[in-house]
């Protein structure tokens, strides 16, 4: 009985999470759940809009990685690598600037998520080893994604969320890591 109740609860939580997500077009319109092309996802439960990664080379290419830099703090004054499609300025500040300039889904206030925000889309009850709903977030890598949060005791590090076990951990800001941007829907 207890086992059935636990399984029912987990299934309800998983279905509830999915019901709260909606796909958005590149212009910011809500589109059908079965659409095969979308650029953002709105999570109605958290009132957050998330960037969706692409399998095509470009600014939102899923394989692009970035060093962490916000223009105010960081390490080596914004050191960047060349692990993004355009091959220059591959740090988080430049990526955010490029996405805001392009007005992804009609908005220009994209940013790195907090630890709690990024953990809110971790799906511990899904059907794959990747801890995210790939029906809404395809092309997500089984790796870590930067948050906006620096480590207080060591400002040369920032927190990241690994989508292979959840939670968060600290990483040196000069190490290339994946990025998924967010904005408030309010």
Where are these regions (language model features)?
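Glycine-aromatic-enriched surface loops/turns that form tight recognition elements
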Residues: 5, 17-111, 115-186
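Sec-dependent signal peptide recognition
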Residues: 2-8
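Hydrophobic h-region of N-terminal signal peptides that target proteins for export
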Residues: 10-18
């Amino acid at each position: 009985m207890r086992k059935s109740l636990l399984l029912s609860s987990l299934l309800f939580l998983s279905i509830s999470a999915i019901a709260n997500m909606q796909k958005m077009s590149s212009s910011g319109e809500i589109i059908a759940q079965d659409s095969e092309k979308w650029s953002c996802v709105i999570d109605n439960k958290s009132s957050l809009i998330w960037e969706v990664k692409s399998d095509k080379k470009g600014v939102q290419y899923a394989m692009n990685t970035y060093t962490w830099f916000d223009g105010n703090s960081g390490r080596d004054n914004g050191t960047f690598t060349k692990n993004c499609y355009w091959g220059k300025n591959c740090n988080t500040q430049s990526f955010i600037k490029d996405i805001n300039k392009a007005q992804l889904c009609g908005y220009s206030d994209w940013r790195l998520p907090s630890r709690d925000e990024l953990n809110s889309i971790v799906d511990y009850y899904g059907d794959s080893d990747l801890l995210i709903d790939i029906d809404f977030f395809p092309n997500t890598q089984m790796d870590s994604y930067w948050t906006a949060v620096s480590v207080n005791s060591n400002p040369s590090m920032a927190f990241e969320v690994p989508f292979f076990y959840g939670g968060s951990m600290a990483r040196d800001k000069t190490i290339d890591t994946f990025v998924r941007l967010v904005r408030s829907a309010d």
